[in-house]
Swiss-Prot record:
Its main location: cytoplasm. It is found in: Cytoplasm. CDD domains: Hsm3_like. It comes from Saccharomyces cerevisiae (strain ATCC 204508 / S288c) (Baker's yeast). This is DNA mismatch repair protein HSM3. The gene is HSM3. InterPro entries: ARM-type_fold, HSM3_C, HSM3_N. Keywords: Chaperone, Cytoplasm, DNA damage, DNA repair. The keyword rRNA-binding does not apply.
């Protein structure tokens, strides 16, 4: 950003400070606050401005026992949120000392508490408050069922997430506060329990193996069964384990699997036992299916964990009304290995099978089990939107693209036929068609062979509204 533009923002902030210090707040003060907030995102620093006086002025409003009806406190907090990261944190501490932050968090003024969280979130170094009771107070507020201010809860969660990259903060959370966290977990009160699950989900991404504590991050069979009494709590618990497994895969935290493997079958048992636990199927089928999908991606010992859950409880293929969901969600490598007959017998190309196709085609062996279900005649009988959904799916992988290019030239003709680009007005159809063209072009000229030029020409018409010509390739690439 230019010096001129930076000066403009600094002048706006100076104007804001002056107007906030007037005896009577101007009528347009909220407009100015909003203007400052919007412009602060355009700068990375304020080199010629001392922000302490403005922060002190804002602090005066937040700590005042008088509530100013004409002042939008959300806008005021937004300015604090953007201003604090730009300031030297030593300067911030001159205005908001550690003692001030403690007083703010213990006050009855929610905007002041939120402002304190914004300051704490940006502390430098991040472990600055690890030896103070500030972290303890944040946890007390977070798990207080009487606290109903969503903005405050969000501010606390955001602050803890930002600071938890620091090992000292994590020690404060899970060593000093372990007995307290265990007590929150043990009472299983809906509000605090759901917040605890959200908190643990956030924290797990930062936890290393030696830091992991089963007593707080894992749940017993008894706790899971008790959670069914409040189906919302049970759903949160299911989602927690789903995110837990996803984090294991995404962050390569396979050391954590041994902590949860024994308890995961309990969810499958509850799913099966509709007689004793009817609410589980009635209200949590979708989230449970997502959990089972994640378990099916644990490849350890030839999918032994999911294979056992499948054999003992889920029984994929035995319940006709769930086959679609299984084929849409479960790891296609597992399906083709252990339920190839279900895949071959149930999948058919239609507008209703797009979700299944997207999942099954993600594995080459599984796709080979269904490729004989395709023919140009079957695909071309579909409405054009559904044609494009099928084609777009077939362009996602090398092996499916090769099948489309070599085995279904008539379908390719429908994709790049004369006038297609200009004739389509439905935005969803345009999206899938353009995505299919782009996916194929990404395979490169050599693999596309004779299809390359017509695909490039059609994509140019779709994106630029004109035919491709020499020199336009850069423009096409820029639009992709």
């Amino acid at each position: 950003m230019s010096e001129k533009e930076t000066n403009y923002v600094e002048n706006l902030l100076t104007q804001l400070e002056n107007e906030l210090n007037e005896d009577n707040l101007p009528e347009d003060i909220n407009t100015l606050l909003r203007k400052c907030s919007l412009n602060l995102v355009t700068v990375v620093s304020l080199p010629d401005m001392d922000v302490k006086p403005l922060l002190a002025t804002i602090k005066r409003f937040l700590t005042s026992n008088v509530s100013y009806d004409s002042l939008n406190y959300d806008y005021l907090l937004d300015v604090v949120d953007k201003l604090v990261p730009m300031a030297d944190f030593d300067d911030v501490l001159e205005v908001y000392s550690a003692e001030d932050l403690v007083k703010a968090l213990r006050s009855e003024i929610d905007p002041l508490k939120v402002a304190a969280c914004r300051v704490i979130e940006n502390s430098q170094p991040k472990g600055l408050f690890a030896t103070s009771n500030i972290i303890d107070i944040l946890l007390d507020i977070l798990f207080d069922e009487k606290v109903e201010n969503d903005k405050l809860i969000t501010a606390i969660e955001k602050a803890l997430e930002r600071l938890s990259t620091d090992e000292l903060i994590r020690r404060r959370l899970f060593d000093n506060n372990l007995p307290y966290l265990v007590s929150v977990k043990g009472r299983m009160e809906t509000v605090s329990f759901v917040r605890l699950i959200d908190f643990l989900t956030i924290e797990f991404q930062f936890i290393s193996g030696p830091e992991f504590k089963d007593i707080i991050f894992c749940f017993t069979k008894e706790e899971i069964l008790k959670s069914v009494e409040d189906i919302l709590v049970f759903i949160e618990l299911v989602n927690y384990y789903t995110k837990f497994l996803l984090e294991i895969r995404n962050q390569d935290k396979y050391w954590a699997l041994r902590h949860v493997k024994k308890i995961l079958p309990v969810f499958a048992q509850l799913f099966e036992d509709t007689e004793n636990y009817p609410d589980v199927r009635a209200f949590s089928t979708n989230c449970l299916l997502q959990l089972f999908a994640e378990v099916s991606r644990i490849e350890e010992d030839e999918y032994s964990l999911f294979k056992t859950m499948d054999k003992d409880s889920l029984k994929i293929g035995s319940e006709a009304k769930l086959i679609t969901e299984w084929l849409e969600l479960i790891n296609p490598q597992y399906l083709v290995k252990y339920h190839k007959d279900v895949v071959e017998n149930y999948f058919h190309v239609s507008g209703y099978s797009i979700g299944m196709l997207r999942n099954l085609s993600a594995d080459e062996e599984c796709f080979n089990a269904i490729r004989n279900k395709f023919s140009a005649e079957i695909v071309l009988r579909l409405p054009y939107l559904e044609q494009m959904q099928v084609v777009e799916t077939l362009t996602r992988y090398e092996y499916t693209s090769k099948f489309l290019l070599n085995e279904m030239p008539k379908v390719m003709g429908s994709l790049i036929g004369d006038g297609s680009a200009g004739a389509i007005i439905d935005l969803e159809t345009v999206h899938y068609r353009n995505s299919a063209l782009r996916n194929l072009l990404d395979k490169g000229e050599e693999k596309l062979s004779v299809w390359y030029e017509p695909l490039l020409r059609e994509y140019s018409k779709a994106v630029n509204g004109k035919n491709y010509s020499t020199g336009s390739e850069t423009k096409i690439a820029d639009c992709r």
